[in-house]
Each structure stands twice: as C-alpha cells, then as structure tokens.
Amino acid sequence: MESVRLLVLVLALLWSPGASGLRFIGDLRMDLSAVIRRVDRSFLSVTVDASLAAEEKFMSLLSSAKVRTLAKALSPSFLRFGGTRQDFMEFSPQRSHQDSGSTEDESCDQLELPSWLENQLKKAWTKQQLTLMREDLHRKYRRVKFTEDTVDLLNSFSVCSGMDLIFGLNALLRTDDNIWNSSNAGSLLQYCESRRYRMSWELGNEPNSYEKKAGVRVDGLQLGRDFSRLREMMSQSEFYRGAGLFGPDVGQPRDRRVDLLEGFLKTGSEAVDAITWHHYYVNGRDTSLEDFLDPEVLDSLALKTKEVLEKVRLVSPEKPVWLGETSSAYGGGAVGLSDTFAAGFMWLDKLGLAAKLGLDVVMRQVFIGSGSYHLVDENLDPLPDYWLSVLYKRLVGPEVLKVEFSSVAQRKRVRLYLHCANRKSYQSGAVTLISMNLSQKPVWISVPARVSSSTVEAFVLQSDRPEEEGLYSRCVTLNGVVLKMVDDRTLPDLKGTRLPPDEHLQLPAFSLAFFVLTDAGAPACK
C-alpha cells in the first residue's frame, strides 16, 4: 500500500525549570493512499429549533436578508426543524390550499423581512426567550398551533438558502391505545404536497424523555410501528414517495434509551433512511470552562458513538447513522460558554471525531432559536462557531484519511484530523489538516522535506483577547483579523495565509486551525 509517512516534528515551548526551550514531542503519520471513511456531502448540517414557532410571528426572522446570507454560506446542508416543542405543536390550517402562499418560483428578494419589522422582532425575541427558558426549567410546555405561514417560511428559507428541509412531526399525538394518531400529520403532508414543497420528515424528538415531559411512555417497538405508519402514508403520496424519513432521534445511550433504540430497530429500521440519535457532552447548568477543554470529555463522544453503531450494525449493517441533534451542553447550552470561543474546541473535535468514527451527518443545534448554543445570536450576528463552520465547509472534503500522532503526552491536547480538501476550493490531491491546541502553550508542526514543495494555506482561529480571558469572548480572529460581516448581505473574505516552503506550521495556544497542503498530491484525493 502506497503510504506517505510525514514526519512532523512537534515542538512545544516549555517553561519548566531547566528546560532548554524546545523539545521533540512526537511524529505524525499520514496515509494519503486510501480513504478510510466518506461522509455525506451535507455532513455539517444545522437545525432551526421548533421554539421559534412557539409564537408564529418569530418565524418571520427566517426572512431576514442577514439570516439568509449567513445560512447560504453553510450550504449544502440539511435543515432540521424540530426539538422538544415539535411534540407539542399541531398543524392548524387557516386557508384553503388554493390561497396564495410562497412558492419556489417567487424571488427570494421578494420575500425579505423589512428592517423595521426585523428590529421589532429581535427586541420581542429577547423577552420570548425568557418565557421559553422558564418552560424548559419546569418542563411545562404549552400546546402550540401553527399555520401554513410556518411551513411557507421554512420552505422559503430552505430553498433560498440552498438547504434541504427536514420537518419534525409531533409523535405525542396518540390514541387511547397509545398508537400514533397520524391525522394531523396527514393534513400537513397534504398541504405541503399541494404547494409542491420538497422536504424530508422526522417523527418525534427524544422519545426517551416523553414520560418526564408529558407523562407518556412509548416503547421502541411501538415507536418503530409508528414510523412504519408514517412511511406508509408517504408511499401513498406520489410527491413524497421517495422523500427521506429519519429517526428515532433518541438521546445518547443510557439505560432505557438503549432499550428504546433496540426496540425501534426491530420494528422501524426498514422505514427510515438513516438512524438518528442526539449527543451533548455536559449539562449546561452544571459545567465549567475546564470541561470544554478536557480531553476526556471530548473523548466521551467516541464511547457513545461506538455503542450506537454496534446496536445499529447488528440489525441494519448498511444503514447510515446520523447525529440528528448535537451541541456542547444540553438544557439549552451553558450560559457564557456555549456561545463563546471556548465552544469551538468541542465543535471542531466533534466534527473530526464523528467523521472518523463513521457518522454520516452531524446536525448542529442550533442555527437560530432559543438557548445559548446557537450559531447566530439574538441580534442575528454570527458567533465563533458559525465562522468555524463556514471554514469547515469551504476547506474540508468528505473523504477521511488516516492520521496518527505518536506522542502520548501531547496527543490529548493537540488534536488532529485529516481529510481530502474540498475539491470545490482546491485542486485534486490537496489535503486539509484539522488542528486544535487545547493547551496554553504554543505548538509548532514542522512539515518534512517529502512535502516541502507543497504550498500551505493556514487558517488559524483565535480569540480576539489573549490567554484564558479570550476563551470567554464572543469574537474570533482569522489569522489575526477579527471576523464580522461586511454588511447584511456580505461575508468577509476568509483568506488563508500562504506559508513558504519548509515553514513550521504554528499552532498558537488555545487555537483552532485548518492547514491546507494544496500540492500534497494525495492519491486518495484524486
């Protein structure tokens, strides 16, 4: 097997007494001859939380020119509309299907939100979030009715942003026999078909928690039968016969959740196109900065993923497995952490590790919605994880390559992943080294002579403030320049810094980076 062993001298600056200054830490081995995994083209995807529709007027924020500009940069992507409140929502049509509504033929510019209304909604959303937080805290959720307007706005947003919509249906509408009552979903499918809205579907959100949230217990076997019923409904529709269906969106493995997943796989695996589960590292109400930088916390994803994959492979070996909802901390995120630069270490490591382990899609909770783990804040401004996501989209291809780091001492805090570069941005044969330095000391990676002729483009993300203080910042720099929108319709140029041949690749303290070896000539990437 043709293999390229890239000796990468990792030099760390040591401050301990008697240290000579620089020390050889270990070497990096890259196999550029073979692809070990290939993820979906929409691997990095996003969600819009159903909380946005708790009061339907807030759905109009999806018509903001600024929000749509930000969303377009994340295409191609799945756009999942769902979350806790999807199981407390009912479709309540208010007009005949012949009435005017948005269509794919309309200009996206015609559907934009006026600036005065956008400002009004942003102010009101601040108050709305407090109401939503109280509901989450007490697990008391209002029953919400949504109209065609919500569906129209979601369709328009997904079409104009170049995203593929996945709509989450209410699974808590149940008969006296505890069977899913599909009549409301039938009305929604009928409306969407009349408008020719192309979308996929889900049914229910974290069914493992229904007993706590709604006093209803649904086992996995019944849930699988409910999905089979939905698939039957879709097959009766000429328009949605070939549409996607994903589920069961169960929480990460733990006791009953494993039983629920196993039961679902027995009766529902053939109904779905991918198995979905959710993952969060920590409790947002009981965490710290140390958790966000703890290698053991980051490594916990591997254990959970392997457990889910083992269960799925026993029943449906070829079925794709997705992280259908994920972020740093559950419970709406960790205030003062999930929306800061520090959250980027969890996010980028999750993307790298998930692809390496064999997950096909990772859906980030949340692009816009309640909580503190969003990519776009309450003022509709992009947060650090947004910029990280855009760079990932532009620089990283779907092909995963093998990379090994020999130093046991540093491999936990210097985390590295390797992909073919995105071929829309770079020529074939280019590779992208995804790099993270979780320590407060800088690290240097020395590219060996074997690839010294390759141009290297460096994209180094750091906080706009120094040292540990900067980890709490909501601003990020790319190669020293603060990232912010030029205007509501324009993102800044996200240009890398070209490094001369034989230059050490510097990974500063507390930094995230993409190093693109543009002329690596990797056989696996041709």
Task: Please name every model-derived segment.
Residues 280-297:
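Active-site His/acidic residue clusters
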